[in-house]
């Protein structure tokens, strides 16, 4: 590694289906104003979802930019497939770090075009200070954790009722659709300054509208691409929240 870079963290990243990526190294340019960590190792996180960096809300700030490296061929192959294709122009991967303090922390991995015209894997810390200020001003009716629980329980009851009515809804295509759609909606709601009292109502409205939008694909048991679901959810959230 070039002498003007220092390793800041070494991350173990759970990406789903029991797969854990090791040796995800985060490096910062020497002379950075960030406080140096006491240890390079022991940091863990889990992949939440893919997003479009062009659609980050205005309150989402950036801090602590890193360059990412790895000696693991599996880790490099994963990020190459998820981020470094030319079609992934503005894609980002949201990672939730294992809590080390009262508030949660998130990293967003993305690509940048390097000086040698090759794409470089980078990431930054998602700065939520402005969102926390907005949340405090909104004076939520219910704690966020309880609302998340209500939304998940509501979705589980809905899926259970659908499965009782029609056994065909247990197909792999349907299950993947529901899981991906729920992931997109929950991620989109968390990345917006949505009043807590509207959280569950918005979730249901976007879920039902998305189901209607892809009714032909569901009827044919066709697999709906993640990017198509994300675009649909983002459009609906913009419509319902005017953001």
From Swiss-Prot:
Chief location: nucleus
Name of protein: Mitochondrial morphogenesis protein SLD7
Key words of the record: Cell cycle, Cytoplasm, Cytoskeleton, DNA replication, Nucleus
Residue stretches spanning the membrane: none
One GO cellular component, as annotated: cytoplasm
GO BP of this protein: DNA replication; regulation of DNA-templated DNA replication initiation
Matches recorded under InterPro entries: Sld7, Sld7_C, Sld7_N
């Amino acid at each position: 590694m070039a002498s003007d870079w220092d390793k800041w963290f070494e991350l173990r990243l759970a990406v789903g289906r029991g797969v854990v990526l090791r040796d995800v190294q985060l490096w910062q340019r020497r002379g950075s104003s960030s406080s140096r960590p006491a240890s390079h190792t022991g940091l863990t996180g889990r992949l939440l979802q893919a997003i479009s960096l062009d659609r980050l809300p205005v309150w989402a700030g950036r801090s602590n930019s890193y360059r990412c490296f790895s000696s693991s061929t599996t880790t490099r192959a994963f990020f190459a497939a998820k981020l470094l294709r030319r079609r992934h122009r503005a894609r980002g991967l949201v990672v939730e770090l294992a809590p080390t303090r009262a508030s949660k922390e998130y990293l967003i991995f993305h690509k940048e075009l390097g000086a040698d015209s090759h794409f470089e894997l980078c990431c930054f810390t998602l700065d939520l200070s402005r969102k926390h200020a907005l949340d405090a001003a909104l004076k939520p009716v219910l704690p966020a954790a309880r609302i998340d629980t209500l939304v998940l329980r509501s979705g589980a009851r809905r899926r259970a009722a659908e499965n009782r009515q029609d056994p065909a809804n247990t197909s792999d295509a349907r299950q993947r659709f529901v899981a991906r759609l729920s992931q997109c909606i929950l991620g989109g709601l968390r990345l917006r300054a949505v009043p807590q009292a509207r959280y569950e109502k918005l979730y249901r409205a976007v879920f039902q509208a998305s189901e209607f939008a892809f009714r032909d694909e569901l009827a044919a048991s066709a697999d709906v691409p993640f990017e198509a679901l994300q675009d649909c959810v983002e459009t609906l959230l913009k419509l319902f929240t005017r953001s």
